């Protein structure tokens, strides 16, 4: 039996609290069970040098974990003087995922930075970050419209992510830490609200997985993401 008695295709309870901080144009506290991430969206006029004069915007992201978001304290990367490879990989993933949610030409020459700070980690921090950051991005873009900076909202649709894997020979959705650490296969899937795939990161930690198992995991991910997107849309409607 899974932790908390979840079925294999069931995601943890997902909570999205909008306007969690007062300064950022968009801010969301996202909770996937005991994993909690604060996601903020900040808008700046102008774009990176490589995009100047092209009439399009840019979306980038930064990711970090608070020192005691994990079971034992991890030193801040700022104190070490550099970011780790895992951090850089995750923040690039978040940025790629969210650029897929926006018409960058319609955004115009604005840069939006998504900051994802893990307050508490219990598996799936990158997938929670993508899900929460998409909400923060949606709120920030709406503010550009409300402030008269944009005529139309360039958001193409919601994006969400979930982890799937094979644990004790069974395919499961939205892994907690105890499952993730024991998984034979671990995969992160990012999709649009209509089920198109943005990114798949999959690794056989133990035995290699079959083509059939891959399809099973992708189907599990799609079902989980449909549930998460429904939660996103309900939160946006409030």
From Swiss-Prot:
Keyword Repeat: no
CDD domains the UniProt entry points to: RNase_PH_bact
Positions that bind phosphate: 86, 124-126
One example GO MF annotation: tRNA binding
Catalysed reactions listed for this entry: tRNA(n+1) + phosphate = tRNA(n) + a ribonucleoside 5'-diphosphate
UniProt-listed Enzyme Commission number(s): 2.7.7.56
GO BP annotations, alphabetical order: rRNA catabolic process; rRNA processing; tRNA processing
SUPFAM superfamilies: Ribonuclease PH domain 2-like, Ribosomal protein S5 domain 2-like
Key word Cytoplasm present: no
Keywords, sorted A to Z: Nucleotidyltransferase, RNA-binding, rRNA processing, Transferase, tRNA processing, tRNA-binding
Family: Belongs to the RNase PH family.
Quaternary structure annotation from Swiss-Prot or TrEMBL: Homohexameric ring arranged as a trimer of dimers.
HAMAP family, sorted: RNase_PH
Physiological role: Phosphorolytic 3'-5' exoribonuclease that plays an important role in tRNA 3'-end maturation. Removes nucleotide residues following the 3'-CCA terminus of tRNAs; can also add nucleotides to the ends of RNA molecules by using nucleoside diphosphates as substrates, but this may not be physiologically important. Probably plays a role in initiation of 16S rRNA degradation (leading to ribosome degradation) during starvation.
NCBIfam families on file: RNasePH
This protein's name: Ribonuclease PH
């Amino acid at each position: 039996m899974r932790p908390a008695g979840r079925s294999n295709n069931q995601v943890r309870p997902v909570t999205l609290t909008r306007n969690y901080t007062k300064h950022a144009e968009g801010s969301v506290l996202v909770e996937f069970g005991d994993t909690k991430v604060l996601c903020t969206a900040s808008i700046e006029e102008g774009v990176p040098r490589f995009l100047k004069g092209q009439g399009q915007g840019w979306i980038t992201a930064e990711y970090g974990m608070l020192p005691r978001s994990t079971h034992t304290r991890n030193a801040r990367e700022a104190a070490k003087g550099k970011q780790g490879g895992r951090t850089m990989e995750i923040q690039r993933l978040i940025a790629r995922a969210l650029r897929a949610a926006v018409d960058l030409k319609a955004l115009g020459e604005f840069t939006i930075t998504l900051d994802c700070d893990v307050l508490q980690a219990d598996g799936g921090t990158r997938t929670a970050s993508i899900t929460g950051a998409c909400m923060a991005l949606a709120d920030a873009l709406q503010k550009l419209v409300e402030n008269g900076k944009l005529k139309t909202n360039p958001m193409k649709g919601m994006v969400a992510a979930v982890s799937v894997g094979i644990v004790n020979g069974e395919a499961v959705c939205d892994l907690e830490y105890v499952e993730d650490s024991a998984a034979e296969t671990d995969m992160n899937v990012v999709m649009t609200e209509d089920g198109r795939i943005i990114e798949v990161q999959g690794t056989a930690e133990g035995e290699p997985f079959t083509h059939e198992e891959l399809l099973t995991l992708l189907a599990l991910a799609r079902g989980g993401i449909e549930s998460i997107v429904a939660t996103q849309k309900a939160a946006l409607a409030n």
